[in-house]
Every structure is written in C-alpha cells, then in structure tokens.
Amino acid sequence: MASSLMSNAATTMAAATTTAQANMVAPFNGLKSISAFPVTRKNNDITSVASNGGRVQCMQVWPPLGMKKFETLSYLPPLSEESLLKEVQYLLNNGWVPCLEFEPTHGFVYREHGNTPGYYDGRYWTMWKLPMFGCTDPSQVVAELEEAKKAYPEAFIRIIGFDNVRQVQCVSFIAYKPASYGA
C-alpha cells in the first residue's frame, strides 16, 4: 500500500514538472546586432518636410473682439426648435438627466476677482429648478426652456446632460442667448 501511494505521488509530481517546463519561456540570449537591420538615409531638405499644401491660404482666424464663443455647438448658427429637440433626445437616449442652468450677466468664463481659476469666474451657473430626473420627452425640456426664457429674457440659458451613475456632466450647450447679445 505504501508503495502504491509512493508511485501515485511520483507520477503526479512528474506530470506537474513536465507541464511547468512546457510553460517556461526561453532564456534571454542578448540583444541582436544592429547591423542586421536595414539602414535608410533620409534627405532632410525642404521637400521632405510635411506640408498642408495650399490649405493655408483658405484658413481663417476667428475674430476675438465682439464675437465670443461659449461651449459645445457655439460655432454653429442658433439651433432651430427641431435641432434642439434632437439634441435633447440624444441626451435622453444616452440615459443622461437633462438640466437647465442660466447666467443673467455673463455667458462665458470671466475673471472678476483674481487671475486664477476659482468659483467666481463664470464657470458655475444658477440651476433652473431641479434636474429633470425621469424625463423621457424632449418637449418637456423645451417647455422648461421657454419658461426660463420668459422669467429671465436677458439671461444666457444652457442645457446640460448629467450622468447620475458616474456623477459627471457629460454635455453642455447654450440653448438661448439674449437678444441684447446680438450674436
């Protein structure tokens, strides 16, 4: 009996050793000689430099005076109601909670109380009511936007999409600019 236990243990040990040896990596043999790689000589004259061709002639710079831009979608023309409904539907399709915020005086980041970023530099807007948890219809959000426009006709109003699982703001865009802004 003792001999049969001994042979079973030896067989098990031998099987474990062979599988361990099969999984081992080959030993390191050193670096290969660099002369084995092909050598290319590059010509560093002006013709080998990357070029964007003639596109430089048609590029324009956004005029920085009197035409401030804000956030996502601000370089597009004002959104029609149909486009606005599609954007809000996108928020809802992604499972984000729509929320309206407004800023009565500045619709952009500004530094009034210092030269370093902080709370009072235009990043934090006033929330319009509460986030619209459970909202499934984009027209509900647009109705709230219209109500906010009536209450604050001279304010900038934006719609944000808030992910309540990750607890982050995923998207934000200006939905209304006051008529006095003129852009």
Curated annotation (Swiss-Prot):
Keyword Heme: no
Subcellular location: Plastid, Chloroplast
Biological classification of the source: Eukaryota, Viridiplantae, Streptophyta, Embryophyta, Tracheophyta
Entry GO terms, CC: chloroplast
Family in the record: Belongs to the RuBisCO small chain family.
GO BP annotations, alphabetical order: photorespiration; reductive pentose-phosphate cycle
Function: RuBisCO catalyzes two reactions: the carboxylation of D-ribulose 1,5-bisphosphate, the primary event in carbon dioxide fixation, as well as the oxidative fragmentation of the pentose substrate. Both reactions occur simultaneously and in competition at the same active site. Although the small subunit is not catalytic it is essential for maximal activity.
Transit peptide, residue positions per record: 1-57
Quaternary structure note: Heterohexadecamer of 8 large and 8 small subunits.
Induction section of the entry: Expressed at intermediate levels.
Keywords: Calvin cycle, Carbon dioxide fixation, Chloroplast, Photorespiration, Photosynthesis, Plastid, Transit peptide
Sample GO molecular function, one term: ribulose-bisphosphate carboxylase activity
Protein name as annotated: Ribulose bisphosphate carboxylase small subunit, chloroplastic 4
Misc. comment: The basic functional RuBisCO is composed of a large chain homodimer in a 'head-to-tail' conformation. In form I RuBisCO this homodimer is arranged in a barrel-like tetramer with the small subunits forming a tetrameric 'cap' on each end of the 'barrel'.
Gene label: RBCS4
Domain of life: Eukaryota
